[in-house]
Amino acid sequence: MAGFPGKEAGPPGGWRKCQEDESPENERHENFYAEIDDFAPSVLTPTGSDSGAGEEDDDGLYQVPTHWPPLMAPTGLSGERVPCRTQAAVTSNTGNSPGSRHTSCPFTLPRGAQPPAPAHQKPTAPTPKPRSRECGPSKTPDPFSWFRKTSCTEGGADSTSRSFMYQKGFEEGLAGLGLDDKSDCESEDESNFRRPSSHSALKQKNGGKGKPSGLFEHLAAHGREFSKLSKHAAQLKRLSGSVMNVLNLDDAQDTRQAKAQRKESTRVPIVTHLTNHVPVIKPACSLFLEGAPGVGKTTMLNHLKAVFGDLTIVVPEPMRYWTHVYENAIKAMHKNVTRARHGREDTSAEVLACQMKFTTPFRVLASRKRSLLVTESGARSVAPLDCWILHDRHLLSASVVFPLMLLRSQLLSYSDFIQVLATFTADPGDTIVWMKLNVEENMRRLKKRGRKHESGLDAGYLKSVNDAYHAVYCAWLLTQYFAPEDIVKVCAGLTTITTVCHQSHTPIIRSGVAEKLYKNSIFSVLKEVIQPFRADAVLLEVCLAFTRTLAYLQFVLVDLSEFQDDLPGCWTEIYMQALKNPAIRSQFFDWAGLSKVISDFERGNRD
């Protein structure tokens, strides 16, 4: 094929040859026809009498239009494209005779092309034509239809037509790339706009001398590579889906509720804990409501939260952690209690696992709350305008009260009881509000609440829980009168509580009262537990740590039988006891930080 610049024979009529100069205009023309060269046939038979003798005449391909840019050919009302560069078109556009050498063009121009104007006329901008009604409101004209096989192309839709050859080669190249002419995922109109234009890349690869055969080779070579990659990607996708299906062992995760929860934007609690905030220091008194199931602790907390608003922080019972995180510990515990499988090691192991899970939220929250305590400000007596931190249960119930009840019921062994007891911790300022209620009324409220896992509980269970609270309360009274070391000596059998009373220089209570408290307290049970190994230092240290920690607490007793459906009256009793007891003190907390921590616990409990 002859090179583009340097053609000697000038074209007739409105056509002119391209001069070899460095002008920007000719450079632009050169770039344009270099791009056309990518799609033009390698051999073009010249027509007419102006073809040079003895040389390959490609003037029909390399003629430069007088005006720039070449415009798109108009279309008919039916959307069909009119023939481009036919004998009539060349005659009307360039003024050439039918015998002119420029009677045809091997390619069709895109939509909107117009014939070049004569040399003496100034180029004018094309006038946009309104879209034809036949196209429809949802159909868009195909901008690449000039690259397709059409019935308007010279030569018809046969295998010898150059336009048909280009279209066929392009479709083969797309098939090599894994792209069909009409994808299953898109409509025909959408597929027209997704056809890649590869002539620029082909031009750069061939040094500006792209050929049709190079286009097909380029598409075929890369098509094989892309088809392999797409095949491998599809295999990996199917494999990953199979692995995920195998790992998805819990069918409950695919329920509608689980999917809705995954879509919701949730905040990770530890992020809010570490977020910087402006500390707001406030004095607050910590109260922990305790009692048997169904006495009305949650009802009281909801009432106080509605009354005091921002002056209170209510910490709910971590029921969701106990029932929805891993196994349901509440259900497992009541199952062991109702089956009455006493004195078995496997039952004790299951009960121990449940009790250790019950203690976890209380220990975590106590540690977090301790970090927000302003120790520099110290503690003070409770004032009327102080804030309140109200908890639904203390660690005391999970690590001391209920394990003691299970030990007496022979559902927990001595060894497992010591393990749970060793987890008990408390801070100075923690006040236990023991809400007492007679068994009959308590049973009525428990049935009214109607929790499924509590349906097997009876009056005997509630009585044993109340007895366990009473034993812990009697032990706490002893810690207020005697030193922890003396109490441990009594538990180890080194002395008696009566001897300790007589040896005291200033006896506070009589020995008979002390002996009665000791027999009804948890210390009498501890003496029985550690008696076989009373010389073991670990057991003695567990007892000593428990006695010292128990002395940190303060107790407030409320008999709910006197306040039947009287929540304000019940709170008044609690409030007055807190004001009158000088040992119950308020501490200073970072109120803003504590509010964020508790809000995260409440959010997790609601979900």
Swiss-Prot record:
Polar residues composition-biased segments: 88-106, 148-160, 194-203
GO MF, any single term: ATP binding
Record: residues binding ATP: G291, A292, P293, G294, V295, G296, K297, T298, R445
Listed Pfam families: Herpes_TK (PF00693), Herpes_TK_C (PF08465)
Gene3D superfamilies named among the record's database cross-references: P-loop containing nucleotide triphosphate hydrolases (3.40.50.300)
GO cellular component term, pick one: host cell nucleus
Active site: E317 (proton acceptor)
Region: Disordered, residue numbers: 1-160, 180-215
Name of this protein: Thymidine kinase
EC number: 2.7.1.21
UniProt xrefs under SUPFAM superfamilies: P-loop containing nucleoside triphosphate hydrolases
Organism whose genome encodes this protein: Epstein-Barr virus (strain AG876)
Catalytic activity: thymidine + ATP = dTMP + ADP + H(+)
Miscellaneous notes: Phosphorylates and thereby activates certain drugs like acyclovir (ACV), valacyclovir, and famciclovir to a toxic form, that leads to successful suppression of the infection, while the uninfected cell does not have this ability because it lacks TK.
